[in-house]
Amino acid sequence: TLMALVVAVLFALVVAACGGTSGGGDGEDSGGDGGGGEDAAVDLPECPVDALENVTAADPVEVTVWHSYVAKTQQALEDLAAQYNDSQDRVVVRVESQGNSYSELQRKYQQAIPSGDLPGIAILEDTQNQSMADSGTVIPLDSCDAADDSFDTEDFLPIALDYYAIDDVVWPVSMNLSTPILYYNRKHFEQAGLDPDNPPTTLAEMRDAAQAIADANIPGIEAPWVQVSNPSFVESWMTGAGVELVNNGNGRDEPATAATIDGNEQLLDLFNYLNDMVDDGLLNPLPDTEGQIDQYTAMATQRSSMAIETTTAATSIEAFLKGQLDTSQLSSDGRINVEGLDLAGLDIDAAPLPGVEEPGRPQVGGGVYYITNTTPPEVQAAAWDFVKFINSTESQVFNNLQGSYMPLLESAVDDPELKATWEDTLSGQWLALGFNQLQTGVDPEAPGITLGPYTEFRDELGTALEDMYFNDGDPADVLGQAQANIDEAITRYQEENF
């Protein structure tokens, strides 16, 4: 129950928020074919890694980290900062929450750009990568890699570098990785005559399972599938099927100049599928509002049997079920309340993301670390030193086990504690599921969209979903309107230099 609620809140942070406006720049460095490396860091901002050499314990450098995490994910970040502070005496890292959603954090970051009053590090949502690169306010990973002989990216997951590369330059200095998976109620599957060990693998099978659950007339179920109208899931379904949503190779061959939504047969088929599911009472769509948790309450109270969310909340879910989670962080409106919930009777499991054609084909998601270039050199160097700590195998293992993010390093999966957790605990098995999707399910040649006005793109795609669900919009019409609005946003981004 609570588990589901927690997942919802954390996932809302991961995928629901695209932030405020995009950053500056002319959009000419969008695109890229993955990778990154020192050869690309020729005309990039410098990373003053040596500026920390003259700093002493008597006058340590302070680095502020902005984030928008909650629950176990927030605690993991705070614990890592404390561990780093205890490990040395020249840098003090201070972790500051800027709200409970990526969009709120992004707005604050954008508002601070004119004054330059930015933190040393900002952990922003993955869709901000192009606009952050264009903003002129951050130092790319490749610059720090080239300047620091003690560091390399050989151990990084290749798909992470591929996804975040723009013209072969990787801008985030660290990546908190997550992917969407299917959460489902095993007891409901059994009651409907379904095999709980063989959950749906495709959207067609999702409909079959939902119909079987509906036909079983299980007491209390209002709709077999509850789902937030989150456009990132649409992106995952389309990316997994090899369908582009903006032109020029999803903006990776060269800067995208238009969306490819209107007249996109595969996307229209998906919208028609979802619309039919709602019309037939098999899917309960929810508005994609900040802090949305109703999908979790539906799962917690067993009013629904299935939901698609990310791996990010796995540890929070488990902690919630065990009564070890401080739920006061998650909601101020009283909607998260464990009293009266049948936690013992809630049997939740997870499976790879059901796809259009095959399972486990998601799009990369999560939060990413950026080092700003508006602070003094010694602060930039101190921020890099902390990031190197975050990028260590030990920290990546800790962040996975405590914060539910996928490890960025391939070496992390060989850690004995991580191995045992992934094999022996419920949350660990879900995390292993997500990691496997990252390794095998994302096409490195087509990992997803890169776009300056990605915020506007996702907002318009989400609006199209909600207009169809809640305003009786015709699928073709809402997609046509989304196309027009996205094209305007792309043109405006190019003309106004952000």
Task: Indicate where each model-derived feature is located.
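Bacterial lipoprotein signal-peptidase II cleavage site
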Residues: C18-D29
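Hinge/lid segment of periplasmic solute-binding proteins
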Residues: D43-V55, D126-I181, W237, Q266, ...
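Short, well-ordered beta-strand elements
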Residues: D59-V70, V91-S97, I121, W171, ...
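Extracytoplasmic "Venus flytrap"/periplasmic binding protein-like
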Residues: Q83-F156, Y163-A165, Q191-G193, T297-M299, ...
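Extracytoplasmic/periplasmic solute-binding protein
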Residues: I166-M175, P180, A204-A259, Q266, ...
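Extracytoplasmic/periplasmic substrate-recognition and gating elements
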Residues: A192, D280-L282, K322-M406, A446
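Glycine-centered hinge/linker elements that transmit conformational signals in sensory
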Residues: D208-Q211, R252-D288, L353
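Long, aromatic- and glycine/proline-rich binding clefts that accommodate carbohydrate-like moieties
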Residues: G345-L353, L401-T463, D467, F498
